[in-house]
């Protein structure tokens, strides 16, 4: 049997890169951490770390065990929450703007599931305006969406600059209309971009319309036109196009349907408010 307490210590050592740093994080002595790792190596019958005077490195078996350890510890947490008195149950219809579904947001969903394994989610991904309307008519319980600056609906989670982006930032020829790749109406980023072009007196043409995130990115990467994009979510190889007018900002908010919130909706809302923020690796704004 592998002791879960030893696995927890090993994961901290692997993450921090050394016994001293792990001991500080765990609030214990370095000798205690080192001894726990030796006990774990004895239990699995493999050497997990290469040690020197400055740092520890994972062996191939150590790298494998880190992956297993995360799965084991996650499963233990779910089981403890299931049997340990967390009686939160229910069904949440949860709407999410497509650009928020980044590599980091699934970690929030996983954290929620670990804490509340008896709550079922009906996940709906789409345009912010559509999800807002579905929330207003009680088709969605909770929505994590964008709004324009100055709008009042929802609870602010974070805001971000909008930028024009494309494969490369070469200037357009004189009088050449700006090629725009966009979602169909009522996309907030589409409206922000077209309004900025109109204010600047620049002509434009909608060179590609798609209601799919992958299609939007593919068209921009292929050079079909420029997109309006949240700055903190800009993925390579797309780059900011500085010669086009500023499309402004977007605010990311939580919106709930009218009426009282269920405990499950409140728990998910609290988790997002405490943990969500600007993304550095992500997708295109919708």
Sequence positions of predicted segments:
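Alpha-helical linker/hinge and terminal dimerization helices associated
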Residues: 43-44, 65-86
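Central regulatory/effector-binding core of bacterial HTH transcription factors
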Residues: 89-150, 210
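A short LG(V/I)-centered, amphipathic sequence patch enriched
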Residues: 41-58
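A late-sequence structural motif
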Residues: 244-286
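Short helix-boundary/capping micro-motifs
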Residues: 11-27
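Conserved amphipathic alpha-helical core elements
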Residues: 10, 40-41
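Secondary-structure junction motif
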Residues: 179-200, 262
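Beta-alpha-beta core module
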Residues: 151-155, 221-261
